[in-house]
């Protein structure tokens, strides 16, 4: 486990999560900021990138799991982005549409922010 909140815990994504995460990545609505749903090949590449980032950086997007049911409902974590020629850390998230509008994204993002400042700083 990476971090937790009252309702959620965040952990590294594993191959066992592939189908759940692929469902999110292949949902046009969930992927609106990425110009649409991912192909099977893009999903596989996404997973490969996550595993590489865990090994090289020690962080990336993590599985967001409901404590009550142990169900993976999305992914949230820290990513590095290029902004005006500078590398900056951002919090990103993607959730299964069935779990939108319940405050999970905000809750997970706040936990990631705390983790970034308390653990990675």
Tell where the protein language model's regions lie, with residue ranges.
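GNAT-family acyltransferases
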Residues: 1-98, 111, 115, 119
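Glycine-rich acyl-CoA binding loop
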Residues: 101-106
């Amino acid at each position: 486990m990476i971090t937790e909140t009252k309702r959620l815990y965040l952990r590294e994504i594993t191959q066992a999560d592939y189908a759940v995460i692929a469902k999110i990545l292949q949902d046009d609505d969930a992927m609106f900021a990425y110009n649409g749903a991912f192909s099977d090949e893009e999903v596989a590449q996404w997973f490969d990138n996550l595993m590489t980032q865990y090994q090289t950086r020690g962080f990336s997007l993590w599985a967001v799991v409901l404590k009550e049911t142990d169900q993976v409902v999305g992914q949230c974590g820290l990513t590095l982005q290029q902004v005006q020629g500078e590398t900056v850390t951002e919090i990103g998230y993607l959730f299964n549409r069935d779990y939108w509008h319940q405050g999970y994204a905000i809750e997970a993002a706040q936990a990631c922010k705390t983790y970034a400042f308390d653990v990675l700083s």
